[in-house]
Amino acid sequence: MNITIISVGKLKEKYLKLGIDEYIKRLTRYAKLNIIEIPDEKAPENLSSAEEQIVKNKEGEGILKNIKDGMYVIALDLKGKMLSSEELADKLQSLGVAGNSNIAFIIGGSLGLSEDVLKRADYKLCFSPMTFPHQLMKLILLEQIYRGLRIIKGEPYHK
């Protein structure tokens, strides 16, 4: 399985980088992993909705350029479907069985994802109705992918 994580924003916090590096190392036993960071656009606090749309569209263009033909795209979106760890494992396994071995997970910037990215997504996944910093979301996503792949292999994991 080939997994690509496309996220907006460069990771700056050292503690998150350490956690992400740990899960990248763990995941190499189960999948080929590629992480792509798209530069985030400057977004001051008081943007109009039109200005927010411009920022999301620019970030979206960078995301879409990195989605290859044939990739199954899972966008992280607050309006997406919430899954348990076991259900995520089932989703990953069913994608592999169906021949979708190239999976891209998309993490938007602080304003979310553009409509074009959401339209390109084959599936929308929500981790929680709460909002998380997108850098932290990358760590949470990697942990859940790792957990899901261990579940698929029938290996023990912490419940």
Swiss-Prot record:
It holds the Pfam family SPOUT_MTase. Its EC number is 2.1.1.177. It comes from the Bacteria. Keywords: Cytoplasm, Methyltransferase, rRNA processing, S-adenosyl-L-methionine, Transferase. It is an enzyme of class 2 (transferase). GO terms for molecular function: rRNA (pseudouridine-N3-)-methyltransferase activity. It catalyses: pseudouridine(1915) in 23S rRNA + S-adenosyl-L-methionine = N(3)-methylpseudouridine(1915) in 23S rRNA + S-adenosyl-L-homocysteine + H(+). It is found in: Cytoplasm. GO terms for cellular component: cytoplasm. S-adenosyl-L-methionine binds at L76, G108, F127, S128, P129, M130, T131, F132. CDD domains: RlmH-like. Specifically methylates the pseudouridine at position 1915 (m3Psi1915) in 23S rRNA. HAMAP family: 23SrRNA_methyltr_H. Homodimer. Belongs to the RNA methyltransferase RlmH family. This is Ribosomal RNA large subunit methyltransferase H. It comes from Alkaliphilus oremlandii (strain OhILAs) (Clostridium oremlandii (strain OhILAs)). The lineage of its organism: Bacteria, Bacillati, Bacillota, Clostridia, Peptostreptococcales.
